[in-house]
Amino acid sequence: MLALYLAPEGRNRLAGKRVLHVSPESILERFVQGAASYETSDPELPGMDHRFDITAIPIEGGGYDAVLCNHVLEHIPNDRAALSELHRILAPGGLAVITLPVIEGWETTYEDPAIDTPELRELYFGRHDHVRYYGRDIRDRIREAGFDLEVFQPSPRQCVEHA
């Protein structure tokens, strides 16, 4: 779905900008490489430009014009700190493209710090490495971190064709 948002306008939107891709997927790199200054970060993946905890980014504020963060926050125990850090490293007017699974029928995010083992997380969140199911209140968390929010909702047809 991120590719749908980035293309075809994504190259123009990111051209000439300094882009940070958090926990990058190689399939998405083609949408920004060659079109922008492009850096990657992940604390575990090999071959990254940076290795840092997304909740404490050791980069000067305002250092990036765009940040791509695709299906990362549902893995981060302190997602509020991560959102604040992503906002901090963006230049004024910068773009953060953040995707995550949201259960639109739920008003409130479901999370419980006591669900802290891979087995329990698999049972409660459907994945051993997820720490929550987001509800609609994620929009408030994003705004509280300082972002202006634009929700991209693919059409049912796009979901069928690209999911």
Predicted feature locations:
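N-terminal juxtadomain amphipathic helix
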Residues: 1-16
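Class I SAM-dependent methyltransferase SAM/SAH-binding core
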Residues: 14-57
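An acidic- and aromatic-residue-enriched active-site/binding cleft used to recognize and process polar
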Residues: 43, 69, 101-103
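A short acidic, Gly/Pro-enriched loop at the edge of an enzyme's catalytic core
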Residues: 55-67
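Active-site micro-motifs of SAM-dependent methyltransferase domains
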Residues: 56, 74, 104
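A short SAM/SAH-binding and catalytic strip from SAM-dependent methyltransferases
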Residues: 66-77
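S-adenosyl-L-methionine-dependent methyltransferase catalytic module, highlighting the catalytic core
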Residues: 77-163
